Every structure is written in structure tokens, then in C-alpha cells.
Amino acid sequence: MRILGIDPGTMVVGYGVIEAADDELSLIGFSSLTPPASAPIPQRLAYIYKGLVEVIELYQPDEVAVESPFADKNIKSALAIGKAQAVALLAAANHSLSVTEYSPACIKSRVSGSGTASKEQIQEMVRLLLNLAEIPQPNDAADALAVAICHHSHRAFANITSQGD
């Protein structure tokens, strides 16, 4: 199964694609989309949408996983991220792809075993789980790979628990 993970944002959108075959994970590709910082939000969202459509058409994922915005103290930031998240959902839906959303705490827990893991710990786990020499850069792409790994872990656990029925 090929999984596209997306770390949404209006300044940078990270994406990462993994292939999951049994318990083996392999890296297919990763990068980020960086719309012009001076562009108004609608133009940045259009740039993100077009870029994600190109990513979907290039990598042909089976499923998409997207990080949900975290609204703690900065509601304005969470709302902006939510707009980028909606664009990611739309790009996937327009390609008839199944999309699952995950909270930051769920991603941390699935990737590292701790919902309170640091960004550095998550990035190191991504490196280890994908058997890479270095942590993927930019950070947004490493975060997107963590989203994809989380989705694989979630699906694997769901398959195990459903076999007992």
C-alpha cells in the first residue's frame, strides 16, 4: 500500500510517500511545497492545491493521511492551517482517495510510543523506521513522513484487532 502523508500549513506544506508491504516500510519520496510568502492566502492555497494534485498524480498513492491542526494558544494559526488542511482533503477527494486525519498527539504516539515526544524524537524515529542515513529535510517533509507512518501503524493495528472477530 502506498501512503501519502501531508503536514499542512499556509507557508510550507510537507509531504512524504511511503510504501508499506507487510511489516516493511520503504521511502518513495518526500519534499515540501512553499507558496510565495508575499502572496495572499487564496493564492497560497491555490498554489498548495495545484502542488498536491501534481504530487498525487506523480506518486499515485492508495490512501492519504493528513495531520489535523493543533489549537492550543494560537487560534489564528490553527485556522490558517485548517485552510491548508481543507485544500489537502479536496485534492485527495478529487482523486477519489481515502483520507484519514490524525492529531499531533496520535502521530507522536504511533511513531514513537509517546504522545509527548519532541519534534526531534519523532524525526529520529522516522529516520530509523525508514532505515535512512539522515533525517529527511526539510522538517515539514519529515513530519509528513511521520503522518504516513502513523497511518500505516493505525491500519496495521486495525487489521490485527479485526482478525479476532
From Swiss-Prot:
One GO CC term, this protein: Holliday junction resolvase complex
GO molecular function, one term: crossover junction DNA endonuclease activity
Catalytic activity: Endonucleolytic cleavage at a junction such as a reciprocal single-stranded crossover between two homologous DNA duplexes (Holliday junction)
Localisation per UniProt entry: Cytoplasm
EC number(s) on file: 3.1.21.10
GO BP: DNA recombination; DNA repair
Enzyme class: hydrolase
Sites where the protein binds Mg(2+) 2: 67
Catalytic residues of the enzyme: 7, 67, 140
Cofactor: Mg(2+)
Record: residues binding Mg(2+) 1: 7, 140
UniProt keyword list: Cytoplasm, DNA damage, DNA recombination, DNA repair, DNA-binding, Endonuclease, Hydrolase, Magnesium, Metal-binding, Nuclease
Pfam (any one): RuvC
UniProt key word Iron-sulfur: no
UniProt xrefs under InterPro entries: RNaseH-like_sf (IPR012337), RNaseH_sf (IPR036397), X-over_junc_endoDNase_Mg_BS (IPR020563), X-over_junc_endoDNase_RuvC (IPR002176)
Cofactor note: Binds 2 Mg(2+) ion per subunit.
UniProt keyword annotation of Acyltransferase present: no
Main location: cytoplasm
Subunit structure of this chain's protein: Homodimer which binds Holliday junction (HJ) DNA. The HJ becomes 2-fold symmetrical on binding to RuvC with unstacked arms; it has a different conformation from HJ DNA in complex with RuvA. In the full resolvosome a probable DNA-RuvA(4)-RuvB(12)-RuvC(2) complex forms which resolves the HJ.
Job of this protein: The RuvA-RuvB-RuvC complex processes Holliday junction (HJ) DNA during genetic recombination and DNA repair. Endonuclease that resolves HJ intermediates. Cleaves cruciform DNA by making single-stranded nicks across the HJ at symmetrical positions within the homologous arms, yielding a 5'-phosphate and a 3'-hydroxyl group; requires a central core of homology in the junction. The consensus cleavage sequence is 5'-(A/T)TT(C/G)-3'. Cleavage occurs on the 3'-side of the TT dinucleotide at the point of strand exchange.
UniProt family annotation: Belongs to the RuvC family.
UniProt protein name: Crossover junction endodeoxyribonuclease RuvC
Gene designation: ruvC
